[in-house]
Amino acid sequence: MATVTATTKVPEIRDVTRIERIGAHSHIRGLGLDDALEPRQASQGMVGQLAARRAAGVVLEMIREGKIAGRAVLIAGQPGTGKTAIAMGMAQALGPDTPFTAIAGSEIFSLEMSKTEALTQAFRRSIGVRIKEETEIIEGEVVEIQIDRPATGTGSKVGKLTLKTTEMETIYDLGTKMIESLTKDKVQAGDVITIDKATGKISKLGRSFTRARDYDAMGSQTKFVQCPDGELQKRKEVVHTVSLHEIDVINSRTQGFLALFSGDTGEIKSEVREQINAKVAEWREEGKAEIIPGVLFIDEVHMLDIESFSFLNRALESDMAPVLIMATNRGITRIRGTSYQSPHGIPIDLLDRLLIVSTTPYSEKDTKQILRIRCEEEDVEMSEDAYTVLTRIGLETSLRYAIQLITAASLVCRKRKGTEVQVDDIKRVYSLFLDESRSTQYMKEYQDAFLFNELKGETMDTS
């Protein structure tokens, strides 16, 4: 008699790993300063630019103390000298509590709203309001939940909830909505919960330590906490931090809070903003709210036109103005919207209001260190000779071009089953992807073959 063996196929289980995107400045963790605001040569992802980083550290300290609201700083330097990196370092050093808004100069030009409205919204996003609110809560460990369901199956449910602390125990009557909330959050005996008396919101803090030895199936995310002590009913101070722009949007229309998620804010009337400013000033006097002047960073500020610069002059003098940080890589150039030239493409009257921080080109040592940091960020192993070649490419072309070759060289290395990027991999991608100067040279040689060539035998200026 033949025996039949049943085989069960086990499905393949794959680990789902979270992919974190790597950006141009994702390696920056701060400005790399010590307690005396002295910059370290290489720290927190920042390399070189010691004078600029020291100046940024002084500005940062004044922002924290709230003494520099309404001031403006201009970071000026050649392309690829770390202007945006310094601004991102300042944002990281300030932390999540200080509002930081970053925009590009060309973002304000839109058909949906005026330039001044776009700038006003950016300014209001950069000013935070810390609102203090006292709420009454009930905090305790659940001893027992009794729910009485009607025998007929219809009608409202009623029940009792027993809560305790280390010093007292109380029984509360439950209505239908509270029973639904407890059922939805799967609250059971042994859970430590808080109930907001004003809203009825239930929050689970965790399981009580006294239930740690219970024979119960628990997930790895289960958190054990101490049983609360003192009174069951407590007063708790809750601090909400919102930006002025969020308050503007919510009060600008009946369903304003929905516009916060959709982004369709439109133009907000000045009357609404004036009323909000008056209300915030009133809260401030009563001690209910605190103004947090944040930072507005405008990259490529030379793209703004003369009307925008005129608006900035007035906006910086307002009592509710954030610290304005601007970056530009232009020299003496034409102010957009006029026929006049000015340093950095910014009018003289606005330049007079700015603290100007200059950046200098990176040295060979600094360039090599930056490339090492980027390789660590992108998980790329590279030989010392390859670092030297890539550094030379970065000095002869641009730092951005050299950084972009790292990932491409890593892919070429993996295709040949290598573990470490070698000089040949760098040479391969260098020959495949042209930099700006080689691309210009190629176009000069084959300019007649291109459609709509406007060079006409003249020397092309690529400076």
Curated annotation (Swiss-Prot):
Modification sites for Phosphoserine: S437
Reaction catalysed by this enzyme: ATP + H2O = ADP + phosphate + H(+)
InterPro entries: AAA+_ATPase (IPR003593), P-loop_NTPase (IPR027417), RuvB-like (IPR027238), RuvB-like_C (IPR041048), RuvBL1/2_DNA/RNA_bd_dom (IPR042487), TIP49_P-loop (IPR010339)
Domain of life assignment: Eukaryota
Main location: nucleus
E.C. designation(s): 3.6.4.12
Binding-site positions, ATP: G77, Q78, P79, G80, T81, G82, K83, T84
GO biological process, alphabetically ordered: box C/D snoRNP assembly; cellular response to estradiol stimulus; cellular response to UV; chromatin remodeling; DNA recombination; DNA repair; establishment of protein localization to chromatin; negative regulation of canonical Wnt signaling pathway
A GO cellular component entry from the record: NuA4 histone acetyltransferase complex
GO MF assignments: ADP binding; ATP binding; ATP hydrolysis activity; ATPase binding; beta-catenin binding; chromatin DNA binding; DNA helicase activity; identical protein binding
Position of the Glycyl lysine isopeptide (Lys-Gly) (interchain with G-Cter in SUMO2) cross-link: K9, K444, K456
Tissues where the protein occurs: Ubiquitously expressed. Highly expressed in testis and thymus.
Pfam families, per the entry: TIP49, TIP49_C
Entry's family note: Belongs to the RuvB family.
Comment block on domains: The C-terminal domain is required for association with ATF2.
Name the record gives this protein: RuvB-like 2
